[in-house]
Amino acid sequence: MQQLAELYPQHISELQSRTKEALSREGIDGLIIHSGQAKRMFLDDNNYPFKCNPQFKAWLPVIDNPNCWLIVNGSDKPKLIFYRPKDFWHKVPPEPNDFWVEQFDVVLLTQADAVEKHLPYDRSRFAYIGEYIEVAKALGFDLVNPDRVLNYLHYQRAYKTDYELVCMRQANALAVAGHNAAAAAFKAGKSEFDINQAYLAAVRQSDNQVPYNNIVALNENSAILHYMEQDVVAPSESRSFLIDAGASFHGYAADITRTYCNGSIPNSSHFAELINGMHQVTLSLADSLKPGVPYSDIHIAAHAQVAQLLHQFDIVNLSPDDILAEQIVSTFFPHGIGHFLGLQVHDVAGHVADDRGTPNPPPAEHPFLRTTRMIEARQVFTIEPGLYFIDSLLADLKSTEKSKFINWDVVDTFRPFGGIRIEDNIIVHRDKNENMTRDLGLN
């Protein structure tokens, strides 16, 4: 894409600037960033699927090649040691020739264990950034993943460059195509397994290429927050469908959730109305993302709006304010309202107050909130309110004095549908918000 090529030099310039500041804080000369290496399964000769170091893929869209290295110091042209072995067992990556190549001095590495000759001779003033501590020690690095460096780099990752925003829009476009295909498969009565296959075919990515394991849940399975099973047999009656699934583009993630209802099923009209109500909650909360507002305030607002739904649909026989006062909402909405999104699905530095890593934990009453940062321009968030009928949490509630406030007959009519989550991906700009998910056609 020409747009990526035009924006990429500024992206590298920003990473150089961040690197220079991180190095000055640690008092060192440079970073050696390791893409990672193949990891063998225990007592086996097969490897786990390769997952690239996010600090490596922040620099360039090489996300599937182990044994690569970057040498960066914030001033000189970054050096890329690109692994290209002689190998007749596996596909060998081609020599780099994409839009990003001119930003690097590229050296080809044919043997993974021969990297030492390409690294700085005196590594005492360089820090290794990566997962493989034993490799770092064998190569003579004393400084490994220093906190001051990572705290600063992680904090700054919340602010996306124009190049990164284009990548994230493209990831959303891919995911939207997948969600549309999955919705069609649900309407055709397909199994969870077949719905997932339809999704993957539409995004043109495998299970190992999408940014996380897709959640594809029919009926009561929609009440399991991280349901991963994917039954191969379609149920005799497909009442509801929740899909939480994303896509990757150049290492950046989309993370989208939708819930659907089969309108031909008895008692489905109220659940369909509840889904529509949750769409309005998502849109309202997305509009509330403003620079200068703590993200935790969005979560508190989500609880208030879910309380309104619990009252409106006669699930709880209390006013919304009293539902909040009795702390009933968390039974039906037990997770956080969202998180940072970027190179990682749950992107880093959500629980810090500054670029030195000062902790800023979530409130005790909302322990699962993944982000407590102040909202600022160029940050990207998910907004994902939900309302679920989870047997274990409902049983806990029923054993308390608060049970008398619950209309259990209504709860029981909703249980077969499982639950609802509606999740959009939002870019916060200085004077507006950009709902990538909706703008790209998924309503």
Swiss-Prot record:
Binds 2 manganese ions per subunit. Mn(2+) 1 binds at residues 255, 339, 384, 423. PROSITE patterns: PROLINE_PEPTIDASE. Pfam families: PepQ_N, Peptidase_M24. Splits dipeptides with a prolyl residue in the C-terminal position. GO terms for cellular component: cytosol. Its cofactor is Mn(2+). Keywords: Dipeptidase, Hydrolase, Manganese, Metal-binding, Metalloprotease, Protease. This is Xaa-Pro dipeptidase. Belongs to the peptidase M24B family. Bacterial-type prolidase subfamily. Mn(2+) 2 binds at residues 244, 255, 423. The lineage of its organism: Bacteria, Pseudomonadati, Pseudomonadota, Gammaproteobacteria, Alteromonadales.
